[in-house]
């Protein structure tokens, strides 16, 4: 007998109070006794942690916390551990007598959550003498030990021979190992199973009736009938899959047109855009090249025109500058001419006035002389009149007074003597003896003049002397000024040098006055030289361009005639060139028409050619003409008919194989499927099911032995069978019934004898049956499976052949349809000449014509250039002709050099004035100081003395002459001397003198009046002459001032030169203005051309840049499009040559139409809808390809790859049509084979329920004698729910009413079950559960049962087991009983999963056992002993069980260290186990040896 596995010990390492403690586990009950806090619960926690190391489940609480969700944060484990590594180990010996140490390493994890790190491991094969602590703890010394880390434990185990260490990455693996070695009763596959096991342990630990377990007793007690449910699920899954596949096929059939529509429209949508982009890119590249060529040519033209414009601008600027200078010069020349004319007129006036003034001056001088003479006469007359009057008065007075007269005569005689003396004195002083009184007047005048000169000289000397004496400092200053200008100068030469410097400054000022004139002349000469240089440059340039030297005007005229003739010739050639270019244009237009015609017919030919190539590929024939196409089409039709016949034969063979396979696959391999139902009705089992496990070697024997009865029904009792048989409605023709024990059937009722290859069966005395061994035995599952395997292989071959035949047939049908379509649509044009080749030839000719046209255009451009050159040459000649005179002018340079010298003098004068002007101005003010050198004062003083003496002498002479002139009239008194001597005659003489004197006086008065009147006339005339002279003189001075202000030197040739210069400048200005107008016209026309060219070039450049940017950007996008298309093998479908001949609008219209259709087609597909929406972005053409790829991928995913032999959706759809009919037929047949009836489902569920009721009934027998307090028995009550009983009745008895559910393809079997449940139980609310979920629940038999726990308590009889109706001890006992029942149920359920030589350990817990009385504890002990179960309980100190092992736990505190003191003892009422015979024999032998 196999012994049950037992827990041997529990080892705790480094727990609170337990450093290294091992508790031996008793085979029955182990009691932990101790006071509060002694460590009982900690010990149980260590046991449970090693058993279930799942921290999400572990929650150790005291009984006051039972059921509380607000327990301590660490769930009671963290606080039970010490710091560092901790271990809990279970030492187990299983049924195979293997020692196993299942342990967990625990370590506190720092943090607020107070988590514990748990690592499970297993030590297997430890020798019996090695304790767990020897492995887990290292002894350091006699009194010290250290807890090993897990890797150290692994090393320590490795050193023990035969021991193995194994760690587990997960709790599932740990529990799987426990289950395999028989430590736990149930295989814990997942967290749900662990939770059930932990809840059971927890309920056992805390005692009482666990509501968590009683509420879900079905999950704990009733095993999941996985086989039944899986059978239903497999059948339902197969049916559902078949139906889904069939629906998918039907949907595919229904959506075939939609798929074709999707492919067609997506191809049109993407290919149209693809080809539009390709065409657009090709056109854009061509346009870009054209624009680039035009842009480059425009740039060259623009550069040429710009250079021309710059050259003309430069010439115009130079010309404008020259013209401005010319205008200034012309205006200056005109002004100068006007000035010269005015100056000449002024000069003429001045000359006329000068002549008048000279005449007036002459007359004035004459008149002055006349006036002076008249004055002299008047003075003399006045003097004579005065003398006469005085003489008369004197004579009268003399006559009146003789003495007075005598005195007067004496006075006169004295005056006469004095006059003679004065004359003598004058003669002596003057040293002129010839001097007379009459000549003294002239001499006196001469001497007075000399006196004035000498006086001036004397005054100058006096001034110099005064200056020399008073202004020595001024002399030094002036002398410094002279030296500043001239450097070192002798003092004696200072005045002279100063005068020379002043003259030089005045000459420089005079030179500066000619600056404007000389500069104007210089500008004139410069312009003439510039014109000369320009003319020479033009001539040189012309010579360079035309290789003709322009030496004279005749050569210019000859060149002009030559260029005129050349212009006429070039214009004629240009006209011929235009005519030839027009002819080529006409030919190009004709070729363009041909190209358009070829382009119009090319798409249809391309489609026809593609269809022809496709036909050639499909058929493998040449198909050279239309006759070969028709002939091959007839051959394809005949092949298709032959292939269809072969396919039908294979279909018949497949149907036969399917029926045989279906029969062998049925239970028992019966030919009649009704036998299973009859066996259930009669309460028996098919004989084939009893012998289902026989080997394949025994199958022929048993098949022959039972013969026709091999499909018999075995019943336990034949009595009453006949009545049941009579009631049968549907029954096979032959039905065999055998009486026997279903569970222990044997073949003893048959008298059989095995012969060679046969069996002879003696039925009775008069009947015997001989049956040979079948060649193919079908009795027993092994034989049937072998046959089924052969049949299925054959069927697979037949199916494959049929599929191949169907595919070939469909392929031939499609090929024939393709021939039909080709003949109908493309036969007329498929064999025409290739329009693309003709199109290429036409395009080549057109390109040649375009090149010729370009050559003519280039030639025409060259002619235009030559024309332009000739026109420019004529223009240059026109410029040169008026100025050819300057070409040979040689005097300009000399004149210019002469003027340069003058301007050099002018510059020197400017420099001299700039350097010394101010100094000379100061010097000019003080130059007179230099006349008298203070160092020459003595010489100057001597000179002054000499001049003064000479002047005094001259004055003495003049005084003598003046005295003589004053006494001149005294010479008339010569007679007075005589009168003094003749005094008697005095009176008479006085009278005579008086008469004479009176007459003289009268005459003198008359002369005086006449002289005065004449003097008055002369003075009047003199005054008028003086006024006229003064006016004329002032006018002349004004004219001279004006003439001086004119600043010109008017001479006879000045006006001629001015006129000549003005006319010359006027002619040059006219020429310059004509050239300026020509240049301006050239600039205007050039600017207009350049503006138009720039505008055109900007537009071309913008278009070029836009096109180039578009081409460059599109290139990357196009490369990505091509890469995508080639990588996904869709380029051949997108690159449709026929679309290349459509316009962009036509392609866009085609794409837009397909886009509208695609929006409707993909409206229900989110991925394709999003891809289509993204593909509408025209800036991202690759997205359309991605959409096309997505469509293909979608179609690839939609098409079943298991039945299609291609990845191309287009071909796959065609191939799928081949398989549709075959698959539809197969799936329909399979569904008929897999269909299950509702009656069989009810029968299976009822049988399973009955089996479980019997099992629970057996479990109740084990609990019938249990008693706790007033409880005398515990049992489980199981019953079928009323609503589910109604469902079973509906399934089995009312099939006809519910055919609409189970025979409908709309519902799966589960959904039909749910619908039926709702139909028969309309009062039950189904909630939110779907029919599928509810149907799956209804396929689980456990949902049909209700389980409850009842107790037989005192006089109340059997009552529902509830904690409130029982005492604490009764509840604990009842709960433990239920848990034992669950553990036993789990062992029964898991028996088939574990090895047959393993019986698992049984152990339960009970904390605080003080709530049980002694009788109850004894009952528990008895229960443990009867059910071979171990029990670990905790009890207070006052309880000491009589049996098992008891540990006394006392917690002691030594300083800051806690330690639990443990004392173990055996129960005093421990009964020894009965000794075996071997043990008794060994004891007897030992006794004999002792004696």
Curated annotation (Swiss-Prot):
Cellular compartment(s): Cytoplasm, Nucleoid
Chain intervals for the UniProt region annotation (Disordered): 1059-1080
Organism domain of life: Bacteria
Region span, Flexible hinge: 667-784
Assigned protein family: Belongs to the SMC family. MukB subfamily.
Assembly information from the UniProt record: Homodimerization via its hinge domain. Binds to DNA via its C-terminal region. Interacts, and probably forms a ternary complex, with MukE and MukF via its C-terminal region. The complex formation is stimulated by calcium or magnesium. Interacts with tubulin-related protein FtsZ.
Protein's UniProt name: Chromosome partition protein MukB
Organism (species): Vibrio cholerae serotype O1 (strain ATCC 39541 / Classical Ogawa 395 / O395)
Encoding gene per record: mukB
């Amino acid at each position: 007998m196999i012994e049950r596995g037992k827990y041997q010990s529990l080892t705790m390492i480094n727990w609170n109070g337990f450093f290294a403690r091992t508790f031996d586990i008793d085979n029955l009950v182990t009691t932990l006794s101790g006071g509060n806090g002694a460590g009982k619960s900690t010990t149980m926690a260590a046991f449970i942690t090693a058993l279930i190391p799942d921290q999400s489940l572990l929650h150790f609480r005291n009984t006051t916390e039972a059921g509380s969700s607000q327990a301590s944060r660490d769930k009671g484990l963290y606080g039970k551990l010490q710091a560092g590594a901790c271990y809990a180990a279970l030492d187990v010996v299983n049924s195979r007598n293997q020692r196993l140490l299942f342990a967990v390493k625990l370590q506190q994890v720092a943090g607020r959550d107070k988590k514990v790190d748990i690592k499970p491991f297993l030590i297997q094969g430890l020798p019996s003498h090695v304790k767990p602590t020897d492995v887990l703890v290292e002894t350091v010394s006699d009194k010290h030990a250290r807890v090993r880390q897990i890797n150290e434990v692994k090393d320590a185990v490795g050193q023990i021979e035969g021991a193995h260490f194994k760690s587990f990455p997960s709790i599932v693996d740990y529990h799987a190992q426990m289950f395999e070695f028989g430590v736990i009763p149930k295989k814990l596959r997942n967290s749900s199973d662990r939770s059930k096991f932990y809840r059971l342990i927890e309920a056992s630990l805390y005692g009482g009736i666990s509501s968590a377990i009683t509420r879900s007793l079905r999950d704990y007690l009733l095993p999941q009938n996985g086989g039944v449910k899986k059978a239903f699920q497999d059948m339902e899954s197969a049916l559902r899959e078949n139906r889904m596949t069939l629906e998918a096929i039907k949907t595919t059939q229904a959506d075939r047109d939609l798929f074709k529509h999707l492919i067609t429209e997506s191809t049109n949508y993407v290919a149209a855009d693809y080809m539009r982009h390709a065409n657009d890119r090709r056109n854009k590249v061509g346009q870009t090249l054209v624009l680039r060529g035009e842009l480059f040519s425009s740039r060259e033209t623009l550069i040429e025109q710009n250079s021309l414009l710059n050259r003309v601008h430069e010439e115009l600027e130079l010309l404008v500058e020259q013209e401005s200078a010319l205008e200034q010069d012309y205006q200056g020349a005109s002004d100068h001419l006007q000035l010269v004319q005015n100056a000449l007129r002024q000069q003429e006036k001045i000359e006329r006035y000068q002549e008048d003034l000279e005449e007036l001056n002459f007359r004035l001088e004459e008149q002055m002389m006349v006036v002076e003479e008249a004055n002299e006469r008047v003075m003399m007359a006045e003097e004579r009149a005065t003398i006469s009057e005085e003489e008369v008065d004197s004579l009268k007075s003399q006559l009146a007074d003789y003495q007075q007269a005598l005195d007067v005569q004496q006075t006169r005689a004295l005056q006469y003597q004095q006059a003679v003396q004065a004359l003598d004195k004058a003669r002596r002083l003057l040293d002129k003896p010839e001097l007379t009184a009459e000549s003294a007047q002239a001499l006196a005048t001469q001497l007075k003049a000399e006196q004035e000169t000498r006086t001036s000289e004397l005054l100058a000397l006096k001034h110099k002397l005064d200056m020399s004496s008073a202004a020595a400092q001024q002399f030094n200053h002036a002398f410094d000024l002279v030296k500043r200008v001239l450097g070192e100068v002798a003092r004696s030469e200072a005045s002279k040098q100063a005068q020379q410097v002043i003259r030089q400054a005045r000459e420089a000022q005079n030179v500066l006055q000619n600056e404007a004139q000389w500069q104007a002349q210089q500008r004139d000469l410069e312009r003439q030289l510039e014109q000369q240089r320009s003319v020479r440059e033009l001539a040189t340039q012309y010579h360079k361009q035309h290789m003709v030297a322009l030496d004279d005007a005749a050569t210019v005229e000859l060149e002009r005639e030559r260029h005129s003739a050349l212009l006429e010739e070039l214009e004629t050639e240009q006209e011929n060139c235009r005519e030839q270019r027009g002819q080529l244009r006409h030919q190009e237009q004709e070729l363009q028409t041909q190209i358009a015609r070829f382009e119009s017919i090319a798409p249809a030919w391309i489609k026809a050619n593609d269809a022809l190539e496709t036909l050639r590929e499909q058929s493998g024939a040449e198909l050279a003409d239309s006759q070969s196409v028709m002939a091959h089409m007839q051959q394809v039709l005949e092949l298709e008919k032959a292939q269809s016949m072969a396919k039908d034969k294979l279909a018949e063979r497949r149907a036969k194989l399917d029926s045989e396979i279906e029969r062998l696959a049925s239970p028992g391999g019966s030919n009649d499927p009704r036998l299973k139902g009859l066996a259930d009705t009669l309460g028996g089992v098919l004989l084939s099911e009893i012998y289902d496990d026989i080997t394949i070697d025994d199958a022929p024997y048993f098949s022959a032995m039972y013969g026709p009865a091999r499909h018999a029904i075995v019943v336990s009792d034949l009595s009453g069978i006949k009545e049941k048989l009579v009631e049968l409605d549907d029954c096979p023709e032959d039905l065999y019934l055998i009486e026997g024990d279903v569970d222990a059937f044997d073949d003893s009722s048959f008298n059989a004898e095995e012969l060679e290859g046969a069996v002879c069966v003696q039925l009775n005395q008069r009947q015997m049956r001989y049956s040979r061994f079948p060649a193919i035995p079908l009795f027993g599952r092994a034989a049937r499976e072998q046959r089924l395997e052969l049949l299925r292989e054959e069927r697979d071959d037949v199916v494959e052949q049929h599929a191949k035949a169907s595919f070939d047939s469909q392929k031939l049908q499609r090929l024939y349809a393709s021939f039909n379509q080709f003949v109908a649509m493309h036969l007329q044009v498929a064999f025409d000449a290739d329009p693309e080749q003709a199109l290429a030839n036409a395009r080549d000719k057109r390109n040649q014509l375009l090149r010729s046209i370009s050559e003519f255009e280039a030639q025409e451009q060259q002619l235009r250039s030559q024309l332009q050159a000739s026109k420019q040459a004529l223009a240059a000649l026109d410029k040169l002709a008026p100025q050819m005179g300057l070409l040979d002018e040689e005097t300009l340079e000399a004149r210019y050099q002469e003027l340069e010298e003058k301007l050099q003098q002018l510059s020197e004068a400017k420099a001299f004035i700039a350097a010394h002007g101010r100094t000379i101005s100061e010097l000019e003010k003080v130059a007179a100081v230099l006349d008298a050198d203070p160092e020459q004062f003595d010489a100057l003083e001597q000179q002054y003395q000499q001049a003064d003496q000479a002047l005094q002498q001259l004055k003495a002479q003049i005084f003598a002459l003046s005295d003589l002139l004053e006494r001149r009239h005294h010479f008339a008194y010569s007679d007075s001397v005589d009168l003094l001597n003749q005094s008697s005659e005095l009176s008479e003489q006085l009278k005579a003198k008086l008469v004479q004197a009176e007459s003289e006086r009268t005459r003198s008065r008359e002369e005086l009046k006449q002289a005065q009147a004449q003097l008055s006339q002369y003075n009047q005339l003199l005054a008028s002459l003086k006024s006229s002279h003064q006016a004329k003189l002032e006018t002349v001075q004004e004219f001279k001032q004006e003439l001086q202000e004119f600043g010109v030197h008017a001479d006879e040739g000045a006006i001629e030169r001015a006129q000549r210069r003005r006319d010359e400048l006027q002619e040059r200005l006219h020429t310059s203005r004509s050239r300026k107008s020509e240049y301006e016209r050239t600039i205007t026309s050039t600017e207009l051309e350049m503006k138009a060219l720039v505008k055109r070039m900007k537009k071309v450049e913008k278009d070029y840049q836009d096109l180039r940017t578009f081409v460059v950007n599109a290139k990357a996008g196009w490369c990505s499009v091509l890469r995508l298309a080639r990588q996904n093998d869709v380029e051949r479908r997108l690159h449709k040559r026929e679309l290349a001949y459509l316009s962009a609008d036509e392609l866009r219209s085609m794409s837009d139409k397909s886009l509208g259709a695609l929006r409707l087609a993909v409206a229900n597909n989110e991925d394709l809808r999003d891809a289509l929406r993204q593909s509408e972005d025209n800036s991202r053409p690759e997205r359309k390809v991605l959409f096309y790829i997505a469509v293909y991928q979608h179609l690839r995913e939609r098409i079943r790859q298991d039945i299609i032999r291609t990845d191309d959706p287009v071909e796959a759809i065609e191939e799928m049509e081949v398989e549709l009919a075959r698959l539809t037929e197969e799936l329909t047949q399979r569904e008929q084979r897999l269909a299950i009836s509702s009656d069989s489902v009810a029968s299976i569920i009822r049988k399973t329920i009955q089996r479980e009721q019997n099992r629970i009934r057996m479990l109740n027998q084990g609990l019938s004698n249990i008693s706790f307090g007033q409880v005398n028995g515990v049992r489980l009550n199981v019953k079928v729910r009323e609503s589910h009983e109604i469902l079973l009745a509906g399934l089995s008895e009312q099939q006809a009413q519910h055919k609409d559910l189970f025979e409908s393809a709309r519902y799966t079997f589960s959904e039909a079950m749910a619908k039926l449940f709702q139909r028969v139980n309309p009062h039950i609310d189904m909630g939110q559960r779907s029919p599928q979920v509810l149907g799956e629940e209804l396929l689980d038999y456990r949902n049909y049962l209700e389980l409850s726990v009842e107790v037989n308590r005192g006089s109340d009889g059997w009552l529902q087991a509830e904690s409130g109706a029982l005492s604490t001890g009764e509840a604990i006992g009842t709960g433990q009983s239920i848990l034992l029942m669950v553990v036993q149920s789990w062992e029964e359920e898991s028996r088939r999963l574990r090895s047959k030589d393993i019986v698992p350990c049984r152990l339960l817990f009970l904390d605080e056992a003080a709530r049980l009385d002694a009788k109850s504890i004894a009952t528990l002990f008895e229960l443990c002993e009867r059910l071979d179960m171990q029990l670990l309980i905790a009890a207070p100190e006052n309880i000491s069980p009589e049996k098992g092992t008891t540990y006394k736990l006392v917690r002691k505190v030594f300083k800051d260290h806690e330690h639990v003191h443990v004392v173990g003892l055996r129960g005093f009422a421990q009964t020894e186990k009965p000794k075996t015979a071997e043990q008794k024999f060994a004891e007897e032998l030992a006794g004999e040896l002792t004696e």
